[in-house]
Amino acid sequence: MSLFELILLAPVDEIETLSEALDALDALSVSVEDADAQTPAEQALFGEPGMPPPKAGWERSRVVSLFASEALARDAASVLTAQDFFAGCQLVAIQAVPEQDWVRLTQSQFTPVEITPEFWIVPTWHEPPEQAKQLIRLDPGLAFGTGTHPTTRMCLRWIAGQGAANKPLARVLDYGCGSGILAIGAAKFGAVDIDAVDIDEAAVESTRANAEANHVTLNAGLPDKAVGAYQTVLANILATPLKVLAPLLCSHVQKGGSLVLAGILERQADELKAAYQPYCQLQVLDQEEGWILMGARF
């Protein structure tokens, strides 16, 4: 069955009402995206302790809905773009969605990712490269972290570098663990006491499943699971929550330990240094595709 996609632009204050209207107009699904994604105007939406609740959408939101027929999609567009209905709603496109073997398509988009020549992230449906002496088996899922993003790769390179330098990671905290990829990487390179925490329970479950699939032992839970001091604290989130979390994250680093932060754009380096200055001296450890890895020794 061919489906049709209706794409609209809408301001943030109309997102919830627009989504309800689409549902009433027989939309099969509705998703909301940042209309400025992959541009300098891109906005991050997140929720962390101590921060206001995230908005329902972006200032300029792209609302994508699926319909069972072109006629239904066009009828919905006519209603929603009428001047007396949603003043800020703009029609972008109505288009057929090609029929796909979604499993095969997804698998084709995720291939082994090289972290170092000997350390790879490999989906379960792929054979590992011959040169891979260390690997993480990981399939794409609901939680962030498959190794394809520069921030994840930089964190994993740092972890691998500690292993190569015979610097055991010992007790590790992965704050904002997502898929658990950093915690699993730490286990692969010698960490023996690992706490992986996230505010999203789906991420916690994903971390547990991925740890089991990789035959590593760790403790996954909500943020209150993080207790005491750690030799290594890893946080791959985004710059704004990293600034808010500065006192908390630094309080978990033991004397002589390391703090490693990612999810930071190059232009945000000075902001992070200022936020962490009362606790430590952040330095840029790595950079890739406009993103940087920052860290400090305590």
Swiss-Prot record:
The keyword Lipid metabolism does not apply. S-adenosyl-L-methionine binds at T152, G176, D198, N236. SUPFAM superfamilies: S-adenosyl-L-methionine-dependent methyltransferases. Its EC number is 2.1.1.-. Its main location: cytoplasm. CDD domains: AdoMet_MTases. Keywords: Cytoplasm, Methyltransferase, S-adenosyl-L-methionine, Transferase. The keyword Membrane does not apply. Pfam families: PrmA. GO terms for cellular component: cytosol. It is found in: Cytoplasm. GO terms for molecular function: protein-lysine N-methyltransferase activity. GO terms for biological process: methylation. It catalyses: L-lysyl-[protein] + 3 S-adenosyl-L-methionine = N(6),N(6),N(6)-trimethyl-L-lysyl-[protein] + 3 S-adenosyl-L-homocysteine + 3 H(+). Belongs to the methyltransferase superfamily. PrmA family. HAMAP family: Methyltr_PrmA. Methylates ribosomal protein L11. This is Ribosomal protein L11 methyltransferase.
